[in-house]
Amino acid sequence: MFLKVHEIAFLFGLLGNIVSFGVFLSPVPTFYGIYKKKSSKGFQSIPYICALASATLLLYYGIMKTHAYLIISINTFGCFIEISYLFLYILYAPREAKISTLKLIVICNIGGLGLLILLVNLLVPKQHRVSTVGWVCAAYSLAVFASPLSVMRKVIKTKSVEYMPFLLSLSLTLNAVMWFFYGLLIKDKFIAMPNILGFLFGVAQMILYMMYQGSTKTDLPTENQLANKTDVNEVPIVAVELPDVGSDNVEGSVRPMK
C-alpha cells in the first residue's frame, strides 16, 4: 500500500527533525574543548549567531503557519542549544570577540527579530504576513548555509580541517536533503529553496575535508610576525624584497641598490 503525499511529507519532516537534532548537537565536542581549555581556540561565533537568528525566525514562521508542528518542535530546541553555545563562547572568548559577539546578538537576534515582528504586524496585511516572514526566513537560512565560507577559506589557507568537523558537514548535507523534500511535498518554497544551496555547500565542505584530511597544517602569520619583518630602510647597501603574505616564495630576494 502506497503512502499518501502528506504521509511522505510527515516522514521527511520527522527525519528532518532527527537529522537537525544531530546538526544542532554536532558542535558539542567543539564547545566541550572550549570549556576544557577555557579558550575559544580561534573559533568564530558568526555561524552560531546566524543559526540562532534562523531558528528564532523559523519558530516565528512556524507559529504563524498552520499545523507547522515539525518546524516549531525542532526550532524550539535549536534556539535553546544555540543560546547555550553562544553563552560558552562569550564566557571564554577574548575581550574583543566577546564585545563583537554581544553586539551582533543584540543587533541580529534581539533587535532584528523585534523589528521584524513590529513591522509585520503594523505594515503587512494579515493575509500576506506568513509569506513575508517566509521570505525573511529563506534569506536568513541562506545566510546560515553561507556562513561556513569563512571557515572553508581558512581550511584552504591552512591546509587543516581542524575548524571544519566532517560530522557537521555530513549532517548539514543530510539535513538539507530532508527539509528540501519536506518543503517540496508540502509545497512550501520558503523551506525547500534554501536547502538546495545548503546541499551544495555541504557537499563542498566534505570535498574540502577529503582533500586536506591528514595534510600538514600551515600556520598563518600572526600580527607580531608581520610587524617584525625586516624594514628595507634598515639596510643601507641592499634592498630586501619581502614576499607577500601567503606567497609560496618564503625566501624573498636581495638586489643591489640603484
From Swiss-Prot:
Main location per the UniProt record: membrane
Membrane topology category: Multi-pass membrane protein
The keyword Transmembrane helix is annotated on this UniProt entry: yes
Extracellular compartment segments: 1-7, 64-69, 125-131, 187-189
Tissue-wise expression: Specifically expressed in nectaries, mostly in the lower half of nectary parenchyma.
Transmembrane segment boundaries: 8-28, 43-63, 70-90, 104-124, 132-152, 166-186, 190-210
Entry-linked InterPro entries: SWEET, SWEET_rpt
Keywords: Cell membrane, Cytoplasmic vesicle, Golgi apparatus, Membrane, Repeat, Sugar transport, Transmembrane, Transmembrane helix, Transport
Residue span(s) of domain MtN3/slv: 10-96, 132-216
Record GO biological process: nectar secretion
Keyword Protein transport belongs to the record: no
Cellular component annotations (GO), alphabetically ordered: cytoplasmic vesicle membrane; plasma membrane; trans-Golgi network membrane; vesicle membrane
Any one Gene Ontology molecular-function term assigned to this protein's record: sugar transmembrane transporter activity
Ranges of the Cytoplasmic topological domain: 29-42, 91-103, 153-165, 211-258
Compartment(s) of residence: Cell membrane; Cytoplasmic vesicle membrane; Golgi apparatus, trans-Golgi network membrane
Superkingdom to which the source organism belongs: Eukaryota
One Pfam family recorded for the sequence: MtN3_slv
Subunit structure: Forms heterooligomers with SWEET1, SWEET5, SWEET8, SWEET11, SWEET13, SWEET16 and SWEET17.
Task of the protein: Mediates both low-affinity uptake and efflux of sugar across the plasma membrane. Nectary-specific sugar transporter required for nectar production by mediating the secretion of sucrose from the nectary parenchyma to the extracellular space.
Family from the record: Belongs to the SWEET sugar transporter family.
Protein name: Bidirectional sugar transporter SWEET9
Lineage of source species: Eukaryota, Viridiplantae, Streptophyta, Embryophyta, Tracheophyta
Name of encoding gene: SWEET9
